Design a protein with these regions (language model features):
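Non-catalytic interaction/regulatory segments
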Residues: 1-146
Length: 146
């Protein structure tokens, strides 16, 4: 479970146009954090509709891992189209590979998301084989083929 503080912009004015929305959003967050609801079914289908609404050009995902830039961590660089649920999909794959995240640097340039993860597995850098498997699964997930 990743928990952080995010600021969001309500471009569609959902909260302003729906008087009960604030309570609904808080209830939904409580359901997910407590484990009573899963995030994936809630996000399913929304990413595509948001991208279509914005008329966004697709940014081809690029995933790169590096064991040379840091003495303690494998550095994972990801560039992809900014989309609803992107960080969730990335963190799910990282978790499925048994990796721990020590630091995440996130940036958005227009519709391009640039995320850098400092990761380990069992408190050591990933092996070459582990890096290949992780980057392959991330690439497939971001391309929608996995």
């Amino acid at each position: 479970l990743f928990l952080d503080i995010f600021q969001f912009t309500d471009d569609e004015r959902f909260l302003a146009l729906n008087p009960d929305a604030h309570t609904q959003v808080l209830h939904l967050l409580e359901e997910v954090v407590s484990g009573r609801s899963e995030v994936e079914p809630l996000l399913r289908g929304r990413e595509q509709s948001v991208l279509q609404w914005r008329g966004t050009a697709r940014v081809p995902p690029v995933v790169h891992s590096d064991n040379e830039a840091s003495g303690r961590f494998t550095i994972l660089d990801i560039v992809a189209g900014n989309a609803l649920g992107l960080l969730y999909r990335i963190s799910r794959v990282i978790s499925q590979h048994g990796c721990e995240v020590d630091l995440v640097l996130m940036s958005t340039e227009g519709e391009r998301a640039i995320d850098v993860f400092h990761i380990t597995k069992a408190e050591v850098k990933l092996t070459e084989a582990e890096q290949r498997a992780l980057t392959s699964d991330l690439q497939g997930t971001l391309e929608g083929t996995l």
